[in-house]
Amino acid sequence: MQPNDITFYQRFEADILAGHKTISIRDDSESHFKAGDILRVGRFEDNQYFCNIEVLSVSPITLDELTQPHAKQENMGLDELKEVIRGIYPNEIIFWVIQFSLKEYFNEEKCVREIIITDRKFN
């Protein structure tokens, strides 16, 4: 099984797949991604792969520099965004905004349908 390059909490999966969440704010340990990178994405809780994203940009930011547009790209309010970041990274000062777009996703139902249809072609 191929390892995931980045993980997201399961609660963000639907927003990513719907295109509502288009950035992720991370600490320095994930600042190495570059524009153009295609990342394999999994859920944090079980590391289950669910999509690929393309990195559009990576830029530094502080909590004080976060704006309403950042919150919108995270699909939440600004106060909620700051609270979530403080909860995940309580001792950090500088963060990295990873802007991304959805490239492709794994849909188990679609995959099963395609296998059934393909199987019918050969029988």
From Swiss-Prot:
The active site is at K21 (proton acceptor), S24 (nucleophile), E74 (proton donor). Gene3D superfamilies: Hypothetical protein (2.30.130.30). It holds the Pfam family ASCH. InterPro entries: AC4CH (IPR008314), ASCH_domain (IPR007374), PUA-like_sf (IPR015947). One of its GO terms (cellular component) is cytosol. One of its GO terms (molecular function) is N4-acetylcytidine amidohydrolase activity. It comes from the Bacteria. SMART domains: ASCH. Residues 6-101 form the ASCH domain. Keywords: Hydrolase. Its EC number is 3.5.1.135. Disulfide bonds: none annotated. It catalyses: N(4)-acetylcytidine + H2O = cytidine + acetate + H(+); N(4)-acetyl-2'-deoxycytidine + H2O = 2'-deoxycytidine + acetate + H(+); N(4)-acetylcytosine + H2O = cytosine + acetate + H(+). Catalyzes the hydrolysis of N(4)-acetylcytidine (ac4C). PANTHER family: UCP029143 FAMILY PROTEIN (PTHR38088:SF2). Belongs to the N(4)-acetylcytidine amidohydrolase family. HAMAP family: ac4C_amidohydr. This is N(4)-acetylcytidine amidohydrolase.
